[in-house]
């Protein structure tokens, strides 16, 4: 962990120690609570070897400034965890503000909502789940982005809410 934090710090990664923690948790499949509670518990050699190799790969990607969320494959948004990859933008706090405003200002559940360039689907899915909107459509020109959105919709049991592909948005 110290080695990972130092490596990221040398690469100029902000919050290097925190990022090293997140990467270690993902690589070894342990969380901080278990790490501290079970410090003296040995890790099986196979798990240690596999985890260490994965940790080194993840550290290298982060040192190359690949976003942490992209390496981990997930980002929390509006209290839900969304899958993300290099084909979509990482959901951000300012986008949560947009969703919160829609939820506050448009309480009618029968509205037809369209999320253009949906990416991960975080806006459309959040509006459907948190707002209870019955007609939410998410579209994107990128098939790769739509795969991510569909994965998120399936995981949150919303695939029937609609994910479509369009060549143009005229």
Predicted features and spans:
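Conserved SAM/SAH cofactor-binding pocket of Class I
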Residues: 94-170
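A general secondary-structure junction signal
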Residues: 22, 75, 166-168
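Conserved AdoMet
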Residues: 25-104
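Short alpha-helical
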Residues: 15, 90, 143-144
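Non-catalytic accessory regions of SAM-dependent methyltransferases
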Residues: 1-41
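A general structural signal for well-ordered alpha-helical segments in protein cores
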Residues: 1, 20, 55, 65-68, ...
